[in-house]
Amino acid sequence: MTAHMADKPHLNMIVTGHIDNGKSTTMGHFLMDLGVVDERTIAQHAEESEKTGKGDTFKYAWVMDNIKDERERGITIDLAFQKFETPKYFFTLIDAPGHRDFIKNMITGASEADCAILVLSAKEGETDTAIAAGGQAREHAFLLKTLGVNQLIVAVNKMDDSKYSEEAYKKTVEKGEGLVKSVGYKLENVPFIPVSGWKGDNLVKRSENMPWYKGKTLLESFDDFKMAEKPVGKPLRVPIQDVYTITGVGTVPVGRVETGTMKPGDKIVVMPSGAQGEIKSIETHHTEMPSAEAGDNIGFNLRGIEKKDIKRGDVLGDPANPPKVAKEFLAQIIVIHHPTALAPGYTPVMHCHTAQVAAIMSEFVSKINPATGAVEEENPKFLKVGDSAIIKIRPVRPTPIETFKEFPEMGRFALRDMGATIAAGIVKEITEEHKV
């Protein structure tokens, strides 16, 4: 890893795919070929893997699992593991939904992704399972699109299993194209790359086993990703993560600026309380800042705001264009997980930016085709896994939320119950606003 890492633009990349399609092996091998993980580590994993009785199957996959375990245990590990660079960018790798909280984290912005890889398998039957209703590839593709991850690369893995056959690749591409198109991606913007996570073909080095493929390697294609514009020109929105009381300083809220900019002296309003005040100072990592903009994680001191007026889940904004607070809104959702079916009146917990609030699914307006938006059924009696629908939602207390069209960062949410994410969605329209 070189010293000029910080000078390159930084992108967060998320790796998704069905459980057995080899995403961890692919990324582990990729990191080894890049020199981010040394061969000694891989050899150690191979030895450990042999002990499981499955041969050295996991020698690459465990590179990613290492990160996951250690993350779950809360240890900060050698950053090189989950960071790598290309000639153009500096990437942080987020290994996707191995765990249940992943979807919630993505929606609430804890793990923000700029771009994604979807790993499919060229092995007979595996992609069919992955893209079927309830398959993880289908679920992940839907979520990526719903959550505003607009840049996608599809890696067609396990080419070594199909003896590097162009026909097997084409079959998988056809299925993969159907999937990414159905969730709303434009095919001309989604490259497909034949790879072998196990053998290393087309990860970093061009494969000699597929002379029929003339496109880029995985590494080369990463440099085609584009940097997203920071939403600094929009009105200020800062969802509050925590509020601390610091002796001698007073009330110090902490949060990430989602849109806009702020500086000491600015007038602000906190919603839903409607309390108004002024920014006294801003700091990040214990360093005072002259200003903050979209993307910055900050703590700040406010003049004129009492501790009782601000809490986690509130949103700070510009008094001239205050954060909206909804009593009811129209949403487009996709049902991800439920043992039976959802009926109107069901009340899961809504997670939106930093807010958590019980919310009633008060009315099912229509069931829709997610690819075209065409109505398939008016006023459905129930919704089941895989359904996309337009519904009305009433949070049990007024909640700061925005339409996805105006503020994508503030207009997406997860509905959770029994420790699982039941549905993910975006706000189409605020139908009843809470006025302070």
From Swiss-Prot:
Annotated spans, G2: 74-78
Subcellular location: Cytoplasm
Pfam families in UniProt: GTP-eEF1A_C (PF22594), GTP_EFTU (PF00009), GTP_EFTU_D2 (PF03144)
Region of interest called G3, as start-end residue ranges on this chain: 95-98
Gene Ontology terms: cellular component: cytoplasm
Entry keyword set: Cytoplasm, Elongation factor, GTP-binding, Hydrolase, Magnesium, Metal-binding, Nucleotide-binding, Protein biosynthesis
GO MF annotation terms: GTP binding; GTPase activity; translation elongation factor activity
EC category: hydrolase
Catalytic reaction annotation: GTP + H2O = GDP + phosphate + H(+)
Region (G5): 196-198
tr-type G domain sequence ranges: 8-232
G1: annotated segments: 17-24
Residues that bind GTP: 17-24, 95-99, 157-160
PROSITE patterns noted in UniProt: G_TR_1 (PS00301), G_TR_2 (PS51722)
PANTHER family attached to this UniProt entry: TRANSLATION FACTOR (PTHR23115)
Family affiliation: Belongs to the TRAFAC class translation factor GTPase superfamily. Classic translation factor GTPase family. EF-Tu/EF-1A subfamily.
Reported function: GTP hydrolase that promotes the GTP-dependent binding of aminoacyl-tRNA to the A-site of ribosomes during protein biosynthesis.
Name used for this protein in its record: Elongation factor 1-alpha
Native species: Cenarchaeum symbiosum (strain A)
This protein's encoding gene: tuf
